[in-house]
């Protein structure tokens, strides 16, 4: 079983590290090509392209300038510990993962990334902001989907083959999973959907849904799941599988309003 998740805009390069294990990203030669393109952009270009403040644009221009691919624990950090968005708040790897959990995650979890393509949890990364959906002109086209082409799909196929089955649990956002070509992916894709109750109606609430993707990732990793039927047992923080609303490989989990944290 292979899990895909999205990265996060919020980064943490300060907290104590929960593991000393690390690996190098597999697609750095492509990252270097993107960095070359990004270095051509001024701060104002970055602000416009990414729709961010001048201050954030200046920070990211500096990051592009300082980026260099000799990654060490002194100038980079493991991806699973560097990202700090809602998905990672739900996963709580730094707080809860054992060494064995990190090793299982290394084989069964992949983070899709605009700059790095595909990151394993223990892959070192330097700070960046480059969302998959932005329009960045490059030698292969006008956006990152054209740049990555089938590279991300092929990398996931290699990971699927290495870990021994063809089940992929898609916990990434649509923006990021659009970088994957399902027709060329050697996998059965499972899509969990998380619905929260609000004023008596169940719907996808972005903050809760993102956190739930992290909770589901943690559940798969800590319980060492290997069978897609086991996904229905997910019950962290009040979510319950709803068979009536699930269809095929779309698994629906619902949570009553009073159980939300």
Curated annotation (Swiss-Prot):
Annotated transmembrane regions: none
Pfam families: H2O2_YaaD
Any single GO BP term: response to hydroperoxide
Source domain of life: Bacteria
Record InterPro entries: YaaA (IPR005583)
CC per GO annotation: cytosol
Similarity comment: Belongs to the UPF0246 family.
Name by which UniProt lists this protein: UPF0246 protein PMI0005
């Amino acid at each position: 079983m292979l899990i895909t998740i999205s990265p996060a805009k919020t980064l943490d390069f300060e907290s104590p590290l929960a593991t000393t294990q690390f690996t190098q990203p597999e697609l750095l030669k492509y990252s270097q090509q993107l960095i070359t393109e990004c270095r051509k952009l001024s701060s104002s270009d970055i602000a416009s392209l990414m729709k961010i403040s001048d201050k954030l644009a200046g920070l990211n221009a500096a990051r592009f300038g300082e980026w260099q691919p000799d990654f060490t624990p002194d100038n980079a950090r493991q991806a699973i510990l560097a990202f700090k968005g809602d998905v990672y708040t739900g996963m709580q790897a730094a707080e809860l993962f054992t060494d064995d959990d990190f090793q299982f995650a290394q084989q069964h979890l992949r983070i899709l990334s605009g700059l790095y393509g595909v990151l394993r949890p223990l892959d070192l990364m330097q700070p960046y902001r480059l969302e998959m959906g932005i329009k960045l002109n490059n030698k292969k086209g006008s956006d990152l989907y054209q740049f990555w082409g089938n590279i991300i799909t092929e990398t996931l196929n290699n990971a699927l083959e290495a870990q021994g089955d063809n089940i992929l649990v898609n916990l990434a956002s649509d923006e990021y999973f659009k970088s994957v070509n399902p027709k060329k992916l050697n996998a059965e894709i499972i899509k969990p959907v998380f619905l929260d109750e609000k004023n008596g109606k169940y719907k996808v609430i972005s903050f809760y849904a993102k956190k739930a993707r992290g909770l589901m990732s943690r559940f798969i990793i800590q319980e060492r799941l290997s069978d897609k039927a086991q996904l229905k047992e997910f019950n962290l923080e009040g979510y319950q599988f709803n068979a009536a609303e699930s269809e095929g490989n779309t698994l629906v989990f619902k949570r009553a309003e009073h159980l939300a944290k």
